[in-house]
């Protein structure tokens, strides 16, 4: 049996017809008590579920809940953070709750939250 190499087996299989390959697979499954389809299906089902479990939120939105008593200070901070003009920043603050920044990293969201809270605003990160 040492005379037959892996390359010989592969060459033999490469020359088989589809029907012969199908019969060979069935014979191997019966002889060794295995199934060619089950492991593939199990891996395919487990793959997406595992990916969802490991997925962590990477983008955050900073939501201005209220300007509080220091509306002018909050408007100034909103302008500095967003680059909006005075009119747009004032409208954003008056329409609270409203997103100040969207889709930013957690560290950046924390910095923006600290800036706005320092000016007297109530802020949430989602």
UniProtKB/Swiss-Prot annotation:
Identification of the protein by name: Large ribosomal subunit protein bL12
A GO BP annotation: translation
Chain's role: Forms part of the ribosomal stalk which helps the ribosome interact with GTP-bound translation factors. Is thus essential for accurate translation.
Keywords: Ribonucleoprotein, Ribosomal protein
A Pfam family the protein falls into: Ribosomal_L12
Keyword Ribonucleoprotein: yes
A single GO cellular-component term on record: cytosolic large ribosomal subunit
Taxonomy, superkingdom: Bacteria
Molecular-function GO term, any one: mRNA binding
Subunit architecture: Homodimer. Part of the ribosomal stalk of the 50S ribosomal subunit. Forms a multimeric L10(L12)X complex, where L10 forms an elongated spine to which 2 to 4 L12 dimers bind in a sequential fashion. Binds GTP-bound translation factors.
InterPro entries (UniProt xref): Ribosomal_bL12 (IPR000206), Ribosomal_bL12_C (IPR013823), Ribosomal_bL12_C/ClpS-like (IPR014719), Ribosomal_bL12_oligo (IPR008932), Ribosomal_bL12_oligo_N_sf (IPR036235)
Family according to the record: Belongs to the bacterial ribosomal protein bL12 family.
HAMAP family according to UniProt: Ribosomal_bL12 (MF_00368)
